[in-house]
């Protein structure tokens, strides 16, 4: 299998894709909205196609009619800055809580390829920290 549609949202920051995983109601679209307000571009909301190309994982919107559209509860479907696709560099699982102050490096395997993974840290600054992570990487 070289592609799969996941129940996930995805944004891109300077070409770095963030796959936002988690169960329904876990805040995937809310996090995507916050990151877009901080300068990210929307790849897809709610459903994301992930394609493996060699050792790269590339995310895109599975329905071209939904590109650049995101649900904001209580407001409706909003237009957002968008990109057609992005190479994934990080995933966050909104359904799992990070309890460590300095967590170990984790990965999730998608289509046989490892992808760096972080868990939901449940603090007010984590969207800002994710933006830095995507722009500049993680040291420790």
Ranges and model annotations:
Residues 1-11:
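Pre-Walker A adenine-sensing motif
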Residues 2-4, 43, 85, 100-101:
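Short solvent-exposed loop/turn micro-motifs enriched in small/polar/acidic residues
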Residues 11, 15-36:
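Glycine-rich phosphate-binding P-loop
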Residues 84-140:
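Conserved NTP phosphate-binding and transfer environment spanning the P-loop NTPase/kinase superfamily
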Residues 37, 41-96:
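Conserved nucleotide-sensing/catalytic segment adjacent to the nucleotide-binding pocket
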Residues 14-15, 51-56, 111:
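Short acidic-glycine loop/turn motifs at beta-strand connectors
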Residues 8-10, 47, 105:
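Short, acidic/polar N-cap/turn motifs at the starts of alpha helices
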């Amino acid at each position: 299998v070289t592609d799969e549609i996941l129940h996930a949202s995805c944004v891109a920051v300077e070409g770095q894709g963030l796959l936002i995983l988690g169960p329904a109601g876990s805040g995937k679209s809310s996090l995507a909205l916050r990151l877009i307000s901080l300068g990210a571009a929307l790849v897809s909301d709610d459903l994301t196609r992930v394609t493996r190309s060699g050792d790269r994982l590339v995310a895109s919107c599975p329905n071209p009619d939904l590109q650049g559209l995101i649900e904001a509860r209580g407001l409706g479907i909003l237009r957002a800055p968008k990109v057609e696709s992005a190479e994934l560099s990080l995933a966050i699982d909104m359904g799992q809580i990070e309890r460590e102050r300095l967590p170990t490096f984790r990965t999730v395997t998608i289509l046989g390829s490892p992808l760096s993974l972080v868990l939901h840290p449940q603090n007010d600054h984590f969207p800002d920290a994710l933006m830095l992570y995507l722009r500049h990487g993680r040291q420790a």
